[in-house]
């Protein structure tokens, strides 16, 4: 029997027996494929011993599926992403479908009714919204369910883009009150910008569009929907961008090639993901290159950034803290 799992993570594929030993779940039988939207979760399944094939893609794999099992709920993913994936499952026409819903029965029934009430309707869940920095052109950006801040501009990302665009455009030296060395932008032809955790490309595209000099833009995200959106936006905007799907930063051959790093790292997991961001920034930047990150409160991120860059300047914007460091 061919089974497709949707919304499952590696921990869902194991159980603990009476002796306290972890083993593959007893219900894992037959030819099973587990779909992931995020390459991190895909790699976790690949590196486990559960015997399940893993596939990572922005959309569900087509095939003659005997069974599709979908795990979702308000704490697991957004309602719009749940509905989007449920519609994709419906269009696969599996022989059998099972929903594992982590939430209230009322919410479960409401989700299913949106497909059952109009089964032939195919909805487009993408959206297009405007974004700009002061003095810059307005960009129309597309995003999909699963992208960070789908349907709206993230204020933290916008604060980061505004600070970086302003500083690069003005080619300013650092504030005289800081011990950081001046950053001579006049020598940069073109600007080499790395946008990590790019999402649909908000920060990278706004910064690139604000510059008069040519820009080499590399964008990285672990989520396939984000990569899909960033590639689409690069094509629409006519911005030459290399968009990478990765959960471990940039490849070694890119080390020491960037002038500017921008990142809006997630705050959860005790800043472990921020460690990956900043380790990548330290590797990827040229000597004299500048790292910009953003967070709501600098108290948590600043100590992490100082492990990789001894000097950190904090710039306040839109109620957020933009942390700025220079690679020695």
Locations of regions flagged by a protein language model:
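Conserved SAM/SAH cofactor-binding pocket of Class I
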Residues: 1-53, 155-174, 188-263
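A short glycine-rich, Lys/Arg-flanked "PGG" loop and its adjoining helix->strand segment in the class I
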Residues: 83-94, 275-287
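C-terminal catalytic and target-recognition region of SAM-dependent MTase-like enzymes
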Residues: 284, 291-328
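SAM-dependent Rossmann-like transferase core, predominantly class I methyltransferases
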Residues: 109-171
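A short helix->loop->beta-strand "cap" motif at the edges of active sites that frequently abuts
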Residues: 93-97, 214-215, 289
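N-terminal auxiliary segments of SAM/dcSAM-dependent transferases
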Residues: 75, 80-87, 91-135
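Short "lid" loop at the C-terminus of a central beta-strand within the Rossmann-like core
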Residues: 103-104, 267-268, 296-300
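Conserved proline-anchored active-site loop of SAM-dependent methyltransferases
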Residues: 67-79, 196-204, 258-270
């Amino acid at each position: 029997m061919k089974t497709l799992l949707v919304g499952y993570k590696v921990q869902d594929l194991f159980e603990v027996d009476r002796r306290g030993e972890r083993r593959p779940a007893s219900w894992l039988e037959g030819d099973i494929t587990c779909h992931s939207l995020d390459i991190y979760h895909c790699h976790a399944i690949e590196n486990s011993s559960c015997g399940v094939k893993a596939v990572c893609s922005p959309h569900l794999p087509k095939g003659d599926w005997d069974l599709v099992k979908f795990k979702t709920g308000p704490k697991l993913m957004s309602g719009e992403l749940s509905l989007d994936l449920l519609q994709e499952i419906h269009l696969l026409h599996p022989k059998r479908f099972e929903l594992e819903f982590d939430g209230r029965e009322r919410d479960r029934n409401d989700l299913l009714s949106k497909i059952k009430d109009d089964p032939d309707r195919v909805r487009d869940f993408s959206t297009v919204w405007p974004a700009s920095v002061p003095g810059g052109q307005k960009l129309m950006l597309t995003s999909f369910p699963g992208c960070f801040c789908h349907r709206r501009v993230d204020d933290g990302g916008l604060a980061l883009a505004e600070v970086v665009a302003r500083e690069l455009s003005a080619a300013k030296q650092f504030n005289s009150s800081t011990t950081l060395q001046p950053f001579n932008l006049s020598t940069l032809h073109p600007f080499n910008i790395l946008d990590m955790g790019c999402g649909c490309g908000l920060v990278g595209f706004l910064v690139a569009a604000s510059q008069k000099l040519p820009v080499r833009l590399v964008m990285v995200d672990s989520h396939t929907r984000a990569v899909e959106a960033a590639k689409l936006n690069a094509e629409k905007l006519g911005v030459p961008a290399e968009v990478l799907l990765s959960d471990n930063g940039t490849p070694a051959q890119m080390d020491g090639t960037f002038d500017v790093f921008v990142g809006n790292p997630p705050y959860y997991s005790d800043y472990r993901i921020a460690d990956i961001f900043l380790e990548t920034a330290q590797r990827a930047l040229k000597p004299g290159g500048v790292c910009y990150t953003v967070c709501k409160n600098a108290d948590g991120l600043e100590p992490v950034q100082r492990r990789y860059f001894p000097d950190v300047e904090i710039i306040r914007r839109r109620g957020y803290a933009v942390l700025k460091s220079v690679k020695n």
